[in-house]
Amino acid sequence: AGFAGDDAPRAVFPSIVGRPRHTGVMVGMGQKDAYVGDEAQSKRGILTLKYPIEHGIVSNWDDMEKIWHHTFYNELRVAPEEHPVLLTEAPLNPKANREKMTQIMFETFNTPAMYVAIQAVLSLYASGRSTGIVLDSGDGLSHTVPIYEGYALPHAILRLDLAGRDLTDSLMKILTERGYSFTTSAEREIVRDVKEKLAYIALDYEQELETSKTSSSVEKSYELPDGQVIPIGSERFRCPEVLFQPSMIGMEAAGIHETTYNSIMKCDVDIRKDLYGNIVLSGGTTMFPGIADRMSKEITALAPSSMKIKVVAPPERKYSVWIGGSILASLSTFQQ
C-alpha cells in the first residue's frame, strides 16, 4: 500500500490476521483481540494466524476489513474519506467480490471515489509496455494474462491454482520427511523464509539432481529462530520446480511455462509474435533466481522454431502490480 506517484510502496506487510490462542491474564496490558500483518508475524508464537485472501480472492471479509483499517490508520496514517482509492483484483475475480470490495470502501471507510484494476494489467504498465503476456504469480494463485494495446483478452486468461503458498507447503513436507517438524501456522512462516532466502530454479532439473547427489556445491545452511542450524541441499531447487512440474505435489495441472504457452495459443494468430516477444514476469513467486532463463528455455521448446522469445523479469517485479497502480492513479486522465 502507498500513495499514487510514489515509486515504491510505503507499507508492505503480509495479509495475515492473528488472534490470541489464550485469554490474557495480565489486566491492563492492553492486549488486542486481533493483530494484523507484521505485528501478527512477530507475535505468531501465541496467535492463530488466518489468511483472509485465498487463491487471490477474499474469503473472509471481516478480517479483510481489519487489514484495510490497519493499512489506512496505522501504516499510511491517512483518513480514507479524504482520498480516492485504487484497489486491485485477481483476473477473473467474481463480480460479487468486486461489489463487496466497493461496498466496504464506500460504506465502512467513506472513500470519495474508487477504482478496481486487474493486477496483471498494472504489472505490464509498470514494465512500460502496452502489449505482452504477464505471468503473475503471488501467494495464492498464478495467472497468465495476454494484453494487447492495453486491453486484457479475457478469453485467453488462464488461472493456475499453484503459487507461493503451495511451494511453502511442499517445502514443509520435504523438511518433515527429513525429520524436522514444521506444522503450526507460525512454523510455516519460518519455512517461507527458508524458501525466499535459499530456493532457486534449476535450468536443467535432472542434471541438477545428479550434481547434488555427488557434490556439495548446492548445500547451504539455515539458522532457525532457536539457534538450531539445518542443512538445506537439493530442496533448494526441488521446492520451486513444482512451478514447472505440478505433478510433483500431485496436482493435475500444466506448469507455468505450459500455461503461458496455452494462453498465447488462445489468442489470435496475428498477435502471438508480440506476446512471445514480451513475456513479463510479476509477483513474489517469480523472484526465484534462474526463473527467467528456465522459462525462456521451456517456452522456446514449445513455440515454433523461428519464433523470437523474450522473457522479461524486472528487478522490482515483486511490487510491479503496485508500481503500475501508482503510475495509473497519478495520470490526470485517470483521475477524471
From Swiss-Prot:
Its EC number is 3.6.4.-. One of its GO terms (cellular component) is cytoplasm. Signal peptide: none annotated. InterPro entries: Actin, Actin/actin-like_CS, Actin_CS, ATPase_NBD. It catalyses: ATP + H2O = ADP + phosphate + H(+). Coiled coil: none annotated. There are at least 5 different actin genes in tomato. This is Actin-41.
